[in-house]
């Protein structure tokens, strides 16, 4: 069945059909396509555009088709152009002419646009639920190792002492903002394009508010060209997916480092690690590495769809068929990563003694040493210089600030006294900063 037959005197070449088809991508929207058609048919009957009898046949036929697809009794034909064509063709074959009346006052342009919004309306809560699950896993890990001291880094150099809870808390805050981005995008997306027609609405006396309400939208899109021709809602969700995956990638990068012998701050559970085919000693953080890699894939989905949309004139263009490949892949990848990483993090064991040992090295308390001199009245820049000289002295003599005799301190600046040792104690450094 071709929805656009009549104008053409030849059958489309098989290569044309194959290239034009989107059934492999959009078949997942069969439920949403049926939901949209039920709302549309019910509205047509309520407005007297089709008969109640035809409407009843349409609704019953669509319900049967849905049940048969779900049960596996009806297989979606992979040679059909798209899911919309398949369902309408199947409906017409079952109920006859009544099925041909379903598309009255509707175009595939607004049909596709409402289907994808309906699908994503259901998909977004799945993603936000998984984000909340990852937040819970991170929060549990932060509480488990709340008082574990570790180095804080800048430029991947040891900078100042912090707690593990503070470090993980940064990712929790990032993920909470990610939640907000998905929720905001879902709110802006929640308006129905149904009734926009091909681009200029329809001459039939349809009720767009009725179908919008029936489908759970907050309202309908007032400009019909906008309704069928923009995919900013897909772009916005892909933007949220991309930022989320950047945060996930950064977290995974740190987990990968922490699990290395060079850091040895953490160890992943065997159930969430892999080995090597040749090196018996290896325990690889493959899940974290894969998630880090998949961040590029999701960012690519966003860049691809942005590039597709940037040069399109109003209204609908076939280029926009690429929207579903991008948004479905982006959302699917995000869900897959969150599903895999949450239990990996929940079962991850930290190694506090190694973290504490690392925090004790690298003169990580030098800023606190300088602040001690400031508390004695020395200007910060002078205190900074004096502490830098102390660090150089320690490096030359192979000692630490904690081990350096007070006489050596006083040789650099006479304002030093025994209180400096309390000031540079790691626990005190962390406590004073409220970390």
Spans of features found by a protein language model:
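A local structural micro-motif
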Residues: 52-53, 150, 183, 220, ...
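A helix-coil-helix interface module used to build multimeric assemblies
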Residues: 1-201, 206-213, 274-275, 286, ...
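Charged, flexible cofactor/metal-binding loops and thiol motifs
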Residues: 121, 143, 151, 157-311, ...
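Generic, well-ordered alpha-helical scaffold segments in large soluble proteins
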Residues: 40, 61, 65-68, 90, ...
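Positions in alpha-helical segments
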Residues: 39-42, 118, 122, 235-239, ...
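Glycine-rich cofactor/substrate-binding loops
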Residues: 1-36, 97-98, 279-435
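Short runs of predominantly hydrophobic/aromatic residues within well-ordered alpha helices
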Residues: 37, 84, 88, 234-237, ...
